[in-house]
UniProtKB/Swiss-Prot annotation:
Removes the pyruvyl group from chorismate, with concomitant aromatization of the ring, to provide 4-hydroxybenzoate (4HB) for the ubiquinone pathway. Substrate binds at R70, L108, E166. It is an enzyme of class 4 (lyase). This is Probable chorismate pyruvate-lyase 1. The keyword NADP does not apply. GO terms for biological process: pyruvate biosynthetic process; ubiquinone biosynthetic process. GO terms for cellular component: cytosol. Pathway: Cofactor biosynthesis; ubiquinone biosynthesis. It comes from the Bacteria. SUPFAM superfamilies: Chorismate lyase-like (SSF64288). It is found in: Cytoplasm. Its main location: cytoplasm.
Length: 185
């Protein structure tokens, strides 16, 4: 399924102010999540395999290029709040992104925001369709979700790309709404 037309550099018209804020919030997500509760990260999968056409296009590599894929779930107080899917081509993994090899359970922000060689492109956002790879991961943790809002950004080092996509699960939005209610009370 080609999902590339779901990603937009412009905010979706149906976004609330809070959703817009979080989907386009600059910088690393990890420290902001840590400020919201007891943060933990679980690596769901880290493997090599063919990239789908949309992912290959986003990385500017040939379709069916073998890629490195890392899927994680980020939890607050034990509750799944954000899922993420990061990928790059195997040649990039063996070159400019070699520090991702065996990366384990640490947040990618530890390397993405500490190297001056790493450049981040602007965010895109999407209302994920059921067939998107990140949606499949997200439905494992939020099977009743009516809508899955996500953002993604491409990071580059010397022309080699890493694509990082993050989906904010309903539990995340419930926490945000609760925090806003406390502020206005």
């Amino acid at each position: 399924m080609d999902t590339s037309h779901y990603w937009s550099s412009r905010p979706l018209s149906e976004l609330t102010g809070s959703e817009h804020h979080w989907l386009f919030l600059p910088g690393a997500l990890t420290p902001r999540l840590k400020a919201m509760g007891d943060y933990s990260i679980e690596v769901v999968e880290q493997s090599h395999g063919p990239l789908n056409p949309e992912e290959a296009q986003a990385l500017n590599v040939s379709p069916n290029t073998i890629g490195w894929v890392r899927e994680v779930v980020m939890k607050l107080d034990g509750e799944a709040c954000v899922t993420a899917r990061s990928l790059t081509s195997v040649p990039a993994l063996n070159g400019d992104w070699a520090d991702l090899n065996g990366y384990g359970r640490r947040p990618l922000a530890e390397i993405l925001y500490t190297s001056e060689q790493t450049l981040r492109e602007p965010f895109q956002c999407a209302l994920l369709p059921p067939g998107a790879p990140l949606a499949a991961l997200s439905y494992r943790y939020a099977p009743q979700a009516e809508r899955l809002l996500a953002r993604r950004s491409r990071f580059t080092r010397n022309g080699s790309a890493l694509l990082v996509s993050e989906c904010f699960l309903p539990a995340f939005w419930a926490r945000v709404e609760y925090a806003q209610a406390l502020k206005s009370a």
